[in-house]
Every structure is written in structure tokens, then in C-alpha cells.
Amino acid sequence: MTNQAPIPVIVNGAAGKMGREVVKAVAQAPDLNLLGAIDSSPEHQGKDAGELAGLSEPLEVPITNQLEPMLGYVAGERQGPPGVIVDFTHPDSVYDNVRSAIAYGIRPVVGTTGLSPAQIQNLADFAEKASTGCLIIPNFSIGMVLLQQAAVTASQYFDHVEIIELHHNQKADAPSGTAIQTAELLAELGKTFNSAIVEETEKIPGARGSLAEEGIRIHSVRLPGLIAHQEVIFGAPGQIYTLRHDTSDRACYMPGVLLAIRKVLQLKSLVYGLEKIL
């Protein structure tokens, strides 16, 4: 039994669907302490984060839209380990959120997708200069990591592959960060996929999906009723090999989120992807 003080945690995007799950998971973890709950939505200001997340008892942590004061408050807590902020916000704000957190010495765990490669590199440089750990994780599901590993193995034997990602219609960015990461992992093999057999003509622009690295196509679907789903489809003469991961409940991401909160304290730079800390 350890007597170490719990890790102070801020949840940014606490009123969102993922944010509420994170609030519940953090509140139920004995080694974590929810100190702040940030959200920009006016209708949730002042509400108790625990009650909003569906917990039976209030946490006495009110929702606020004041990020910088909360970062300063947690940074000023000199007892125990450094603070961690979990960000599930919006592609338009996540870059500034992460820079602000690092500037205060707060370790970011980022689940928000939509950051450009240039933004990720800038954050990596900033985190390294500050010797501050930062995790950017497109998908916190252990099952998705296993799918990606299986896809990398399969891509050694198949020359044709396409990715289909399906999400709820409130997701702002496309393709998903997970689909982009999957394509990047396949592209690391250094082979070119999907060499054209015929000269293709798109009668409607975008009909063949977006073109990622090394000829890999990504198709995005946005519909109500979906949460998060991905297929990686390999083809060869006479056969199709399909890998698929389906999310039926956002609770499946919480083991990965909690692992990331604990692991980010051990880092001195930015790390991209859940597979790097498993």
C-alpha cells in the first residue's frame, strides 16, 4: 500500500460525452484526484462535474470555462505529483490548450483529434524544451491498438488496402485521427499500396475517399447512431481480408485514459500513440 499523494487531474471538455466518462473514471480511481473540470458550453457553467457525469454523489467540482486560472491553481499545488490535464475538446482549441498546459508545467493527455502534423511537431518541440511529458493519443482503446498491429502484419502480404472509418455525426474532423494513424503505420513499411490497374475518373470529387500516404485510401462516414468504428480492408486475387473494431460504449476507452494519466508523469517529451506506452 503506497502513501503517495494522488495525481491531481483536470478534465477539459468535461461536459462532453467523452469528458463525462473521464470524470467518472478519474473520480473512481483511488490514486487520482479530480481538481478541475473545464468546459466552454454556457449551459453547464457552475454545475457539479460529478452530477453531470451521472455519479450518485456530487464531487464538489464545479464546471468552469476558466482554463488558465485552473492551470495556475493546479500548478501552484506543491504537494504531491505534478498535475495532468485530459483534453477532449475541439480541433480549433486543442493546440492552444496544450501549449498553455505545458507552459504551466501541467502534463497534457490529449484525446482530441484534428491536430496537423506541423502542430504536433511544434508541440513536441515545446514539450521537449520544457522537459514536460505530453501524450497525444488518437484512440485510447486497447482493441484498436491490436487492430492496428494486425493491420501492420497483414500489410506485409497484401498490396491493396483501404480504410473505412465511421463515427457519430457530431465529430468535427475527418478523416479520424485513428484512421490517419493507421495509414501512417502501414506507410512506415515503405511500400506503395493500391497501384492502379486502370485510370480512375471520379464523377463526383471525393468519391474514392481521401488519399493518404503510400496510396492508401481513407473513407469517412458520419451518421447518428454510430459511436466509433473502423475497418481495414485488404484485397488480393480471390480473397478479401477485413479487420474491424467497433465501439459500443465509451467506457471502453477509460482503461487507456487512466493508463495515460499515470504514464505521462514518467515522460519528459511528447509521445504519440497508445501503443508507445503499453
UniProtKB/Swiss-Prot annotation:
Q: What class does this enzyme belong to in the EC scheme?
A: oxidoreductase
What is the E.C. number?
Answer: 1.17.1.8
Q: Does the keyword Cytoplasm apply?
A: yes
Kindly state which reaction or reactions the protein catalyses.
Answer: (S)-2,3,4,5-tetrahydrodipicolinate + NAD(+) + H2O = (2S,4S)-4-hydroxy-2,3,4,5-tetrahydrodipicolinate + NADH + H(+); (S)-2,3,4,5-tetrahydrodipicolinate + NADP(+) + H2O = (2S,4S)-4-hydroxy-2,3,4,5-tetrahydrodipicolinate + NADPH + H(+)
Keyword Cytoplasm applies: yes
Active site: which residues?
Answer: 167 (proton donor/acceptor), 171 (proton donor)
Compartments where located: Cytoplasm
Its function? Answer: Catalyzes the conversion of 4-hydroxy-tetrahydrodipicolinate (HTPA) to tetrahydrodipicolinate.
Q: Which HAMAP family match?
A: DapB (MF_00102)
- Please give the name of this protein: 4-hydroxy-tetrahydrodipicolinate reductase
Source species of the chain: Nostoc sp. (strain PCC 7120 / SAG 25.82 / UTEX 2576)
Name of the gene this protein is made from: dapB
